[in-house]
């Protein structure tokens, strides 16, 4: 008798990096996550959403319930996603300004973050960006985001062994496995919230 493998429904994940730097380690984590889903996490499809084109939030830009085209396109991508993957750097114990700006634009009526499962990954020195995660979780309460609790993913990018190459690509295999566990947890949590 042949083994039957259950095919998991496709989960679309919108991935946002709070760092705009060209060789950002956070964007590198998202590239690695995309590669991992292609290699070893079937049923998960990650799309990187570039937040750099978003204008600073300004309600004067809202006209008759509509937003600038770049904001409308961003909001539509969030709306169409089943879940969210945030790569959140820590700036002054908090989230970065570009990420907060994206959170604010997508929270304008109607709030397109509402009821989305989410996960946070962070890297940096010292605490590996962990303090930004707690602030992002706090913001997420108001936005009705539902974060996975475990595994937490923080990474000291400057401790040996080398974690990233000169272009910001994740090269450490142990870290890739930790990242994979976050993706599997996000997948399972999303399916649970969807009742599947």
From Swiss-Prot:
Annotated keywords: Cell membrane, Flavoprotein, FMN, Membrane, NAD, NADP, Oxidoreductase
Annotated SUPFAM superfamilies: Flavoproteins
GO molecular function, one term: NADPH dehydrogenase (quinone) activity
Family matches, as Gene3D superfamilies: 3.40.50.360
Highest classification ranks of the organism: Eukaryota, Viridiplantae, Streptophyta, Embryophyta, Tracheophyta
Domain of life per record: Eukaryota
Subcellular location: Cell membrane
The protein's required cofactors: FMN
Main location: membrane
This protein's name: NADPH:quinone oxidoreductase
Reactions mediated catalytically: a quinone + NADH + H(+) = a quinol + NAD(+); a quinone + NADPH + H(+) = a quinol + NADP(+)
Pfam families according to UniProt: FMN_red (PF03358)
